[in-house]
Amino acid sequence: MSETLLYSGKAKDLFSTDDPEVLKMIYKDQATALNGKRKEQITGKGEVNYEISKLIFAYLSQQGIETHLIKNVSETEQLVKKVTIIPLEVVLRNVVAGSFARKFGQPLGQRLEQPIIEYYYKNDALDDPAINISQATALKLVTPTEVATIEAMTKQINTLLIKLFNEIGIDLIDFKLEFGRYQGRLILADEFSPDNCRLWDQKTHSSLDKDVFRQNKGDLVTVYETVLQRLTKMIGGFANV
């Protein structure tokens, strides 16, 4: 198989394959914070992120959410559909945490009356600034129709994952999604792992996500493996793709 590196990100690399419509995605043993300014190699992180995202994407697919995942290849590699990524990070918040708490001076852990969706322009040179829909459409990053689809899919994913994580004793605090255009429709791309969501244990209220790395609160891989073990018991059968 002929492979060329097309993109090297903070947590994953993308390679071409012999099929122009298919890419290989490889999860890396790298943790980052401060929008990539702090980096650290952590053995085993790529594999555990791969395993968690594999389970979540398979589960969402079974629930009717189309994703870019085609096939799991190895312990850190997947074949995915070649999409045109919409350059927006879509953040949904169920509970006050992170930058939302700091920006608005709200108490950490306060449950929001309804989920809040925020958008950030995917541009490393600009440090991924917050952007509203009027700005995003004016810059032709996305169309109004696509925004409606993105918001509907994001809310549906939130409903599904709140229920799933609740069943394994975890609160879904917030998460980030990315979407791509594929054959005239929008599909879920990127990954879903503790790298791009906040998860709190319902009994201890401890972080089960990348805040462990950001705040130096413990061993990242051990924490991620806790999430993986609980998910595997609940939805391990969905991942046979």
Curated annotation (Swiss-Prot):
Record-linked Pfam families: SAICAR_synt
* Stored CDD domains: SAICAR_synt_PurC
What biological process terms from GO does the record include? 'de novo' IMP biosynthetic process; cobalamin biosynthetic process
> SUPFAM superfamilies in the record, alphabetically?
SAICAR synthase-like (SSF56104)
The record's annotation in PROSITE patterns points to: SAICAR_SYNTHETASE_1, SAICAR_SYNTHETASE_2
Q: What InterPro entries does this protein map onto?
A: SAICAR_synt/ADE2_N (IPR028923), SAICAR_synt_PurC (IPR033934), SAICAR_synth (IPR001636), SAICAR_synthetase (IPR050089), SAICAR_synthetase_CS (IPR018236)
Q: In which pathway does it act?
A: Purine metabolism; IMP biosynthesis via de novo pathway; 5-amino-1-(5-phospho-D-ribosyl)imidazole-4-carboxamide from 5-amino-1-(5-phospho-D-ribosyl)imidazole-4-carboxylate: step 1/2
A single GO molecular function term of this UniProt record = ATP binding
First-level EC class: ligase
Q: Which reaction does it catalyse?
A: 5-amino-1-(5-phospho-D-ribosyl)imidazole-4-carboxylate + L-aspartate + ATP = (2S)-2-[5-amino-1-(5-phospho-beta-D-ribosyl)imidazole-4-carboxamido]succinate + ADP + phosphate + 2 H(+)
- E.C. number: 6.3.2.6
Top-level taxon of the source organism:
Bacteria
Instruction: Recite the UniProt keywords alphabetically.
Output: ATP-binding, Ligase, Nucleotide-binding, Purine biosynthesis
Give the record's family classification: Belongs to the SAICAR synthetase family.
Q: PANTHER family of this UniProt entry? A: MULTIFUNCTIONAL PROTEIN ADE2, SI:DKEY-6E2.2
Q: What is this protein called?
A: Phosphoribosylaminoimidazole-succinocarboxamide synthase
Protein species of origin: Latilactobacillus sakei subsp. sakei (strain 23K) (Lactobacillus sakei subsp. sakei)
